Swiss-Prot record:
UniProt-annotated location(s): Bacterial flagellum basal body
Pfam families the UniProt entry points to: Flg_bb_rod
InterPro entries: Flag_bb_rod_N, Flagellar_basal_body_rod_CS, FlgB
Quaternary structure, from the entry: The basal body constitutes a major portion of the flagellar organelle and consists of a number of rings mounted on a central rod. In Gram-negative bacteria, at least four rings, L, P, S and M are present, whereas Gram-positive bacteria lack the L and P rings. The rod consists of about 26 subunits of FlgG in the distal portion, and FlgB, FlgC and FlgF build up the proximal portion of the rod with about 6 subunits each.
A GO BP annotation: bacterial-type flagellum-dependent cell motility
Chain's gene name: flgB
Keyword Cytoplasm: no
GO cellular component: bacterial-type flagellum basal body, rod
Protein name (record): Flagellar basal body rod protein FlgB
Transmembrane segments: none
Family: Belongs to the flagella basal body rod proteins family.
Keywords: Bacterial flagellum
Keyword NAD: no
Length: 137
């Protein structure tokens, strides 16, 4: 019984963590939309969640984010990401080499935000259900 609860919450915790990391990556893409040569990045959420659930977290062996220009806005100083960062293939590259498509980034940012909120709502409803069962005895 407790294993099922632990697995359910572990899955939700990992999903929230990955959604949070993706949100930071998308925010960095948006922040660097006017930076010449900036390459838009993202993660494959489904593949990363599957990998995390099968193998567990990689801990300190994660991918270290680096800036290729001093004008890039960092995601976070010393930020370590366990997910594999992918470079987004642009539909049309700008003349300065920047691959950020603001329409796509805003759409992905909003979609990820809605899914994050849905995950939080789902977890809250699970906790409330368990609390109701425990209170009723």
């Amino acid at each position: 019984m407790l294993d099922k609860l632990e697995n359910t919450f572990h899955f939700q915790q990992e999903a929230l963590s990955l959604r949070n990391k993706r949100q930071e990556i998308l925010a960095a893409n948006i922040a660097n939309a006017d930076t010449p040569g900036f390459q838009a990045r993202d993660i494959d959420f489904a593949a990363e969640l599957k990998k995390t659930m099968e193998n567990g977290r990689t801990g300190s062996h994660g991918l270290q984010l680096t800036m290729t220009s001093e004008r890039h806005i960092p995601i976070k100083p010393g930020y370590r990401l366990e997910a594999d960062l992918l470079y987004r293939v642009p539909h049309q590259t700008s003349m300065d080499g920047n691959t950020v498509d603001m329409d796509m980034e805003r759409s992905n940012f909003a979609d990820n935000s809605v899914k994050y909120q849905a995950d939080v709502t789902f977890i809250n409803s699970q906790v409330k259900s368990m609390m109701a069962v425990l209170q009723q005895g």
